[in-house]
Amino acid sequence: TVLTVPNDDKDLWPTLGPQVCEFIEAYLIFGPGDLRGMPARLDQEKRAFIYRMYEVFPQDHPQAGRRRFKRVGLSLAKGQAKTELAAWIAAAELHQEGPVRCIGWRNGAPLGGPVTDPYIPIVSYTEQQTEELCYGTLYTVIHEGPLDRDFDAGLTKSGRRDGDGRAVPLAAAPSARDGSLTTFQVA
């Protein structure tokens, strides 16, 4: 695997980042810990990461509206709420109104819409890590927050109440699951 750091562009790319950040701060909460149940708040570093993560090709490009990056990685020091951030992004990707895909343009800016039938494996080295860390945080964020009515959240999977889309904790590579079309992954 080759990791490439994108160049600092002089021109800003269109991004769904502002819409994703607004969704997170309007509807999601902190998971287990001192801030449990408090409204989600993004610092400037996490906001910049989300803006970059959700950059799309411009309207006049042959791939207009498609994500600029297929994969993104984030490395932060311990205690920087990485698990919370992953759970918040997974919740936005899972929600039936999450503005995570470009569905059109308004005044040259991308409009965000949901994934039709998301499949989100939440992968860790061990099953215990998966359940106690990110999936456990995702469960808390959606089960104890304002979006609880939109999800059927359980200890083994969380999905939309309408039946389309789910997030599942896994302790192995998602590619080993035949027939599963991964739309977003937390590892």
Map each language-model feature to its residues.
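Phosphate/NTP-binding elements of NTP-utilizing enzymes
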Residues: 1-187
